[in-house]
């Protein structure tokens, strides 16, 4: 059935826009240039407002997910990377459940990637229609069919640009992937803004700066009671405070520490005697993939819940899925779940919220740990990183594990890789929960993604430098 499905979509994949693989080795400085160009295009799209929208001031149901999904409300990047990640989630679940089978051949892998791109484009159109028809930009009946269609076209073209930018980097023209680059940029931008944002907000305590560090100096300079000023700077509510910033730095340090955990399996050359090496199996074997897929799952659940609650607010089943309320605190208008499944799958707002509703906290922890472990375990099967795939790669490189024959390598690798994938996913989920409870800036998931992505870029840089030999030769 799997091969039939891939063969069925083959004609559609042939007409999709595609980035050709480079015909020569791309130098590091060229990769840096292409990466910078890709990032520049993304940031420009984040600032260009959608033409034709009547209003984007209503409560934002995806406020909590925007940092993770690299989206910016009311702009061309309204959808962010959500369509790409959602299509990856769907294809992974289909492959993991054996509904479709992906072979080891390059042809099957190419068809699988093509199917993922096709689904990404379909999801982009679907999400654009949902956003417009649920009134996120104004009443569709007042805007008219022409304006609604124009907004949908803008969102689709922007989504296609994101798909192609991601493929550009994935094909080897740049560093890393577009998804990782956009997420890390968005999260780092949020952290810097929450720390140094110069905008002022009128609160019950008076006018305060949004940035936690600027607010510290402002409070110390304007308040006569310095001890109370320090207390406010560290613990103020509804605005970034210094404890949030300290929690963010702490989570950064913990994740970087865990990045170093790995098991080195001794391998040797089957051709040349005396040539030994090691194959590292990291604790975060699947890196940040589990948390990205988990975020995609939750964000799509939010989309469906918001769409249904807008149309059928009194329905019992709709309320069971999620009941939403608009935030009454200072800051941007946002909607948040107050009951139903969406509420229990959303992180508690603070440690105080954990004490107020421990059932919510327990369900959220179980969901995070379970979903991350599941996605991590299934991802290795469809991404070419399972024990069978690793054994095949070592065999192609004429390497064998010391003390084991070629035939027993898969069995030995199976002792480590699935365990590392599941336990690593569990740790990723646990660290995300810890960051949420500590109140880290940008959400626990966002911080975790930022650290793992920055670490990936650090590893890429070190690898490129070791191949060239010196820093000067790498950049000039």
Swiss-Prot record:
SUPFAM superfamilies: Preprotein translocase SecY subunit (SSF103491)
Main localization category: endoplasmic reticulum
UniProt-annotated location(s): Endoplasmic reticulum membrane
Regions of this protein lying in the Lumenal compartment: 54-76, 139-144, 194-240, 310-354, 442-445
Ranges of the Cytoplasmic topological domain: 2-33, 97-117, 166-172, 262-288, 376-420, 463-476
One GO CC term on file: endoplasmic reticulum membrane
Record membrane topology: Multi-pass membrane protein
Domain of life where this protein originates: Eukaryota
Alphabetized InterPro entries for the sequence: SecY/SEC61-alpha (IPR002208), SecY_CS (IPR030659), SecY_dom_sf (IPR023201), Translocon_Sec61/SecY_plug_dom (IPR019561)
Annotated TM spans: 34-53, 77-96, 118-138, 145-165, 173-193, 241-261, 289-309, 355-375, 421-441, 446-462
The keyword Transmembrane helix is annotated on this UniProt entry: yes
Keyword Endoplasmic reticulum included in the entry's annotation: yes
Keyword terms: Developmental protein, Endoplasmic reticulum, Membrane, Protein transport, Translocation, Transmembrane, Transmembrane helix, Transport
Biological process, per Gene Ontology: pronephric nephron development; protein targeting to ER; protein transport
Job description of the protein: Component of SEC61 channel-forming translocon complex that mediates transport of signal peptide-containing precursor polypeptides across the endoplasmic reticulum (ER). Forms a ribosome receptor and a gated pore in the ER membrane, both functions required for cotranslational translocation of nascent polypeptides. May cooperate with auxiliary protein SEC62, SEC63 and HSPA5/BiP to enable post-translational transport of small presecretory proteins.
The family this protein is said to belong to: Belongs to the SecY/SEC61-alpha family.
SUBUNIT field: The SEC61 channel-forming translocon complex consists of channel-forming core components SEC61A1, SEC61B and SEC61G and different auxiliary components such as SEC62 and SEC63. The SEC61 channel associates with the multi-pass translocon (MPT) complex.
Protein known as: Protein transport protein Sec61 subunit alpha
Organism per entry: Bovichtus variegatus
């Amino acid at each position: 059935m799997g091969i039939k499905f891939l063969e069925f979509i083959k004609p559609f994949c042939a007409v999709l826009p595609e980035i050709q693989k480079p015909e020569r080795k791309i130098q590091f400085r060229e990769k840096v240039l292409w990466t910078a160009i890709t990032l520049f295009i993304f940031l420009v799209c984040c600032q260009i407002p959608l033409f034709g929208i009547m209003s984007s001031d209503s409560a934002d149901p995806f406020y909590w997910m925007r940092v993770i999904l690299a989206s910016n409300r009311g702009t061309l990047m309204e959808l962010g990377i959500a369509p790409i990640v959602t299509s990856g989630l769907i294809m992974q679940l289909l492959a993991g459940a054996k509904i479709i089978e992906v072979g080891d051949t390059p042809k099957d892998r190419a068809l699988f990637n093509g199917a993922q791109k096709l689904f990404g484009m379909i999801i982009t159109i679907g999400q654009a229609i949902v956003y417009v028809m649920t009134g996120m930009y104004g009443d569709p009946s007042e805007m008219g069919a022409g304006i609604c269609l124009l907004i949908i076209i803008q969102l689709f073209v922007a989504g296609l640009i994101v798909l192609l930018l991601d493929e550009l980097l994935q094909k080897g023209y740049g560093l890393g992937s577009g998804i990782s680059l956009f997420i890390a940029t968005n999260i780092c931008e949020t952290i810097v803004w929450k720390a140094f944002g110069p905008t002022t907000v009128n609160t019950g305590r008076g006018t305060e700066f949004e940035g936690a560090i600027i607010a510290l100096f402002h409070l110390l300079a304007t308040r006569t009671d310095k001890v109370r000023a320090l207390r406010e700077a560290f613990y103020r509510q509804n605005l970034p405070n210094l404890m949030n910033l300290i929690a963010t730095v702490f989570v950064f340090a913990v994740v970087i520490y865990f990045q170093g955990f790995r098991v080195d399996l001794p391998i040797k050359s089957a051709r040349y005697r005396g040539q030994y090496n090691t194959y590292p199996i990291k604790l975060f074997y699947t890196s940040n993939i589990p948390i990205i897929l988990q975020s995609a799952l939750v964000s799509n659940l939010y989309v469906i819940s918001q769409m249904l609650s807008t149309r059928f607010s009194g329905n019992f089943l709709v309320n069971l899925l999620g009941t939403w309320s608009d935030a009454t605190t200072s800051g941007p208008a946002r909607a948040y779940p107050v009951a139903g499944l969406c509420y229990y799958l959303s992180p508690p707002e603070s440690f105080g919220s954990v004490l107020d509703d421990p059932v919510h906290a327990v369900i959220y922890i179980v969901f995070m740990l379970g979903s991350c472990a599941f996605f991590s375990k299934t991802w290795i099967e469809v991404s070419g990183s399972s024990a069978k795939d690793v054994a095949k790669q070592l065999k192609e490189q004429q390497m064998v594990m010391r003390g084991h024959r070629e035939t027993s390598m898969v069995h030995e690798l199976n002792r480590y890789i699935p365990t590392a994938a599941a336990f690593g996913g569990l740790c990723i989920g646990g660290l995300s929960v810890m960051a949420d409870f500590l109140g880290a800036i940008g959400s626990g998931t966002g911080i975790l993604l930022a650290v793992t992505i920055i670490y990936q870029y650090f590893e890429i840089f070190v690898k490129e430098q070791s191949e060239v030999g010196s820093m000067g030769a790498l950049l000039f």
